[in-house]
Amino acid sequence: MTRTIAISVEQLYRPQPGGIATYVRGLATGLAALDDESLDVIGVAARGVPRDGLPLRAVHAHVGVNLLTRLWPTWPLGVPGNADVVHATSMAGPFAGGKSTAVHSVSMHDLLWRDEAATSTKAGIQFHERRLKLIASHDDLRVIVTAPSLVGRLADVGIESGRVHAVRLGVNDPGEVASRASVGEVLAGHGVRGPFTLYVGTREPRKNLERLLEAHRQARSINGELGNLVLVGPSGWGGVATGDATVLGTVPRAVLNGLYRDAAVVAYVPRAEGWGLPPVEALHAGSRVVASITTPSVEDNTEVVRVDPLDVNAITQGLVTALTLGDDDASRSRRQASVADLTWRNVALDHLAAWQ
């Protein structure tokens, strides 16, 4: 008996797709990896949006992504009528549709518009508050979270814990990894030679780059093996100064994988975070990692040097400490093993359990 699962994929085509887009791709990939012929996974997309190579069948609504987002709270446009599960991969929706017996769920990745209100727009805050109120009012809507700490916080806004299901997130298999020589050429083209400290993520105020820059300067004066600070990723909401760091911007995936592998330390110290994929990707590569205590993805990982993101001295000491950790094959294998269960296949299994 076929079970039809409809998931929203419109996030992939927004101006700032961000981590939610990674989650959408990963969930689709994980469901496909189950190789379960009884599952028919459909992506609900906006008008004219291509599939982006996802391993699913796409259906397209007759409107653009912005109008679709405004309509979804009241009208499940684009959702197949035979769907057994309708899953909103973000607070955009949809929140209804499918069979009369369909399971409806929504993923909530964070409350960052509250945690970092100063770096959110007024319109963004209003949008998320309206959607939060809508989600809380739909008693039959299951809420899927990736940060266990959200369970208690959502209870405070009227979403009972029985409705909330915590799931893991995953990391892509490395795929192609650039050679050390190729990575060295990329870095040399930007004036970086020798060891380097790596940051991966958007460049925006919430990511706390100003403190990371200062901490790295202090730590490098203690141990020069930290090398240059290299920033990889696009600019985000709100400009930030990058000081003496080397900005590579967005790089091909194979190069990013090589940078993770070759970095002396990977540092990720946001003030607030929904989940935090880069530290997991770094561990997957076997690298030494410094991450803030506000990063849910590694909050229980003993292989990570965790620091207070608001304390420059703590970040400094964390970088210095990370360099003292082993970088031999056994140490790298241990770090890889610490995130071995964070696969998109397991993410898909967690979602299927939530949809029972």
Residue locations for each model-derived region?
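Carbohydrate transferase catalytic cores enriched for Leloir-type hexosyltransferases
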Residues: 1-356
